[in-house]
Amino acid sequence: MIELDLCFGLLLLILFGLLSLRNGHVSLAHIRFICQCWLVMITPLEVQDFALCILTVVLLQSFHSFEALLFLLLAYIGQLYMMHSCNLVSFYVCLEAQTLCVVVLCGLLARGASTSFSVEAALKFLLLSAMVSGMALFWFSAMYQRTGSLDMVGQETFWILLVMLFKLGVAPMHMWSVDLYGSIPKSLLLYLSTAPKLSLFTFWASSWHHDFSVGVFILFSMFIGSIGAYGQPALRSLFAYSTINEIGLLLLAVETAGFHTLYQHLGIYIITQLLLWNLTDKRLFALCAVSLAGLPPFAGFFGKAWIFWHAMSVQAFSLLAAALFCTLLSLVYYLRVIRLFWTAPVHTAASFTGAPNQTTLTSACAVALAFAPVMLVKPFVI
């Protein structure tokens, strides 16, 4: 029944948007407000679903066209269903729905001189995604022919793992993410670095279980993410490799610590990303880099320390040594970013003029980044 409610509500929203855009008395802000209310009303009362809803509501503020809002909502529906899918076909359809929405948004939001680069990166992502998804779909059909069932329970799950790792941008399947990070608009970059990762890890925790070790992908992601950032001329490319390194740490949490620690560090990562790509204050940007580097007293330090502590508890010493080495290695280019932005001239007054929503978001995320260690330090002292 909820599927019919979603489809009917989305059709009404499309109709309202198409009619309102022709009316000079109805602005895009009204449509955005209705989209946000609709998201809250349709979301089930579960923690991960509500977190994805709140994140999408925040991300809607960065998009300034009705078409972009519509595709963002379609991607949200795909993510919401994928998080609770227990069937191979439903997982495939929902996952590809959000992929197609991202590709279309790359074309819609491309502006200026970076248009060709954005379209090229989107096409690379689409073709690589189609290749991986096609191979997975062939495997799904082979499983159905052999077992007569499409349920995930009792099936061999290697191709599901491979598709998920590709969508997360895990090394060595990461080149599409570097191209996209360097060419797409900032609003879409903020979406791509947060919402899909939350939905994929939630699906991993709630609907899907595997017997494969991801230790090889952890090592690839951490080493490529920490080494590949050196020599990058663009800041976006640097943070693309930083994201690959962070994904390696999140996989290390899955491998050694469990999903509670995963959600803890993923929440810190999302808050930091919301700050990074919404800032015009350069010194606050530098503080976000401090948290990403894992330096105390910010939340990023305690998130990484909690993962390392669990890795030591389960005696995964090889992964722990690699993670510590890559963290120290990545600290060098984070310090370059900190030096660059902390010593730059600050224009605080211009940073917050005429953007009340952005100011509220920045303030809330900055408070969370600073005071989250108060909660994260409890396991170490109790």
From Swiss-Prot:
It comes from the Eukaryota. It is an enzyme of class 7 (translocase). It catalyses: a ubiquinone + NADH + 5 H(+)(in) = a ubiquinol + NAD(+) + 4 H(+)(out). Disulfide bonds: none annotated. GO terms for cellular component: mitochondrial inner membrane. The chain crosses the membrane at residues 1-21, 33-53, 54-74, 88-108, 123-143, 158-178, 188-208, 212-232, 239-259, 260-280, 284-304, 305-325. Its EC number is 7.1.1.2. One of its GO terms (molecular function) is NADH dehydrogenase (ubiquinone) activity. It is a multi-pass membrane protein. It is found in: Mitochondrion inner membrane. Pfam families: Proton_antipo_M. Its main location: mitochondrion. Keywords: Electron transport, Membrane, Mitochondrion, Mitochondrion inner membrane, NAD, Respiratory chain, Translocase, Transmembrane, Transmembrane helix, Transport, Ubiquinone. Belongs to the complex I subunit 2 family. Core subunit of the mitochondrial membrane respiratory chain NADH dehydrogenase (Complex I) that is believed to belong to the minimal assembly required for catalysis. Complex I functions in the transfer of electrons from NADH to the respiratory chain. The immediate electron acceptor for the enzyme is believed to be ubiquinone. PANTHER family: NADH DEHYDROGENASE. This is NADH-ubiquinone oxidoreductase chain 2. It comes from Chlamydomonas reinhardtii (Chlamydomonas smithii). The lineage of its organism: Eukaryota, Viridiplantae, Chlorophyta, core chlorophytes, Chlorophyceae.
